[in-house]
């Protein structure tokens, strides 16, 4: 089977870190000669630190993979993962849509690769100083989950401060946009997918809902009644279910061994449910950290998510859905998409929010709700409002959609960057 061009746009993956380095010590050549175990490639990679606050020794670590073909003419994509506090390099670059996936001690090709707001803006400004040849490129800011805060807030700041970036659009997947609606949609998802009983659904909606539980847990004031409800929900769902994709198996030692064999055979149609374990092992290798020009300061090991950087958890409750409206009114294209097997931020809440925003903005439906295709199969459903605000689902996809549905995610994202409608009929030719 032939595959599409490997990396179709340059992608920056950025993660906030705390460093005790001087500017001189991190301003050297960031070019990555080669990552340990990687296959031969025809594109350049860079990794290093961009200081955003010299006084407090704060920096963003980035990994940048150029487009494989004609990199000088391809758009630039900034990808931010959520959490808060989770790694865009570990999750986005190595588990989802970066150029490689780890497999044991080596890296294998990913054929469906996608090659606090003020801090992110400072990062972009300084990154463009380091890479001035990219400043005129079309820029798209993208992310998932809690990046439903980071991404629109960064785009809003670029517009408000009239920063001269060529910002064209934002895309956010399974995003946290409104605390109550997003979190309370879990109950319906659990019940409709057979994960909880009728009586537990009733308790989870009328006695104590998930937004109440989350709010109380954050403030450490969980009441006995809410504690009983969430224990019952957890008991029925089972801890052996992956809530980020309820159809996906969990990683077990025997599966990990099998996954490494399959990956080395480059069976790219298989989902490696143990990719996080393999990524964790790979990124904790000293030779890999040296190749990335990375330095662990204040922590013993790299982890997917960390609380070393402190986040105000109350910010979870700050709604960002109306920021999307401001961006759309400013002419910035907005795509909100949902992996339809995610129970953490289910599509039902997201669809309700986007539909409500379109009504609030007075946007007419320009593409009625319909199926879209990836190759010969239905890949999801989509609706477009005013040719500026789009909602789409990715069929069979997880919270991290490119992880479980890389091909469909690539079709969605490529169409959005090109300003094209999602394919509305089956293609008999696979690329």
Residue ranges of each PLM-predicted region?
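Terminal and linker regions of secretory-pathway proteins
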Residues: 2-431
């Amino acid at each position: 089977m032939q595959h599409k061009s490997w990396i179709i746009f340059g992608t920056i993956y950025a993660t906030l870190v705390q460093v005790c380095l001087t500017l001189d010590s991190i301003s050297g050549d960031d070019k990555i000669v080669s990552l340990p175990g990687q296959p031969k490639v025809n594109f350049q990679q860079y990794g290093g630190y961009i200081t955003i606050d010299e006084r407090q020794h704060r920096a963003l670590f980035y990994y940048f993979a150029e487009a494989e073909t004609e990199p000088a003419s391809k758009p630039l994509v900034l990808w931010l993962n959520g959490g808060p506090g989770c790694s865009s390099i570990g999750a986005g670059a190595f588990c989802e849509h970066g150029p490689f996936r780890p497999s044991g001690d080596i890296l294998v090709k990913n054929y469906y690769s996608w090659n606090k707001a003020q801090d992110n803006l400072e990062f972009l400004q300084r990154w463009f100083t380091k890479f001035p040849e990219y400043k005129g490129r079309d820029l798209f800011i993208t992310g998932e989950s809690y990046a439903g805060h980071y991404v629109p807030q960064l785009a809003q700041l670029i517009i408000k401060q009239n920063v001269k970036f060529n910002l064209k659009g934002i895309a956010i997947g399974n995003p946290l946009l409104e605390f109550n609606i997003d979190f309370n949609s879990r109950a319906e998802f659990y019940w409709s997918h057979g994960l909880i009983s009728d009586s537990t659904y009733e308790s989870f909606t009328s006695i104590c809902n998930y937004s109440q539980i989350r709010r109380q847990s954050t403030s450490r004031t969980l009441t006995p009644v809410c504690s009983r409800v969430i224990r019952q929900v957890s008991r029925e769902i089972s801890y052996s279910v992956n809530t980020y994709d309820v159809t996906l198996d969990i990683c077990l030692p025997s599966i990990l061994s099998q996954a490494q064999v399959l990956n080395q055979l480059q069976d790219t149609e298989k989902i490696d449910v143990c990719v996080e374990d393999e990524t964790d092992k790979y990124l904790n290798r000293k030779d890999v950290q040296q190749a990335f020009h990375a330095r662990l300061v204040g922590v013993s090991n790299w982890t997917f998510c960390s609380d070393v950087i402190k986040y105000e958890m109350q910010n979870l409750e700050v709604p960002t859905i109306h920021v999307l409206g401001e961006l759309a009114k400013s002419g910035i294209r907005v795509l909100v998409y949902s992996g339809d097997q995610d129970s953490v931020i289910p599509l039902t809440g997201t669809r309700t929010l986007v539909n409500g925003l379109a009504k609030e903005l007075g946007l007419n439906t320009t593409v009625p709700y319909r199926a879209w295709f990836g190759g010969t199969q239905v890949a999801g459903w989509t609706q477009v409002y005013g040719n500026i605000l789009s909602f789409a689902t990715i069929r069979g996809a997880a919270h991290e959609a490119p992880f479980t549905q890389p091909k469909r995610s690539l079709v969605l994202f490529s169409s959005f960057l090109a300003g094209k409608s999602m394919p509305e009929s089956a293609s008999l030719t696979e690329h």
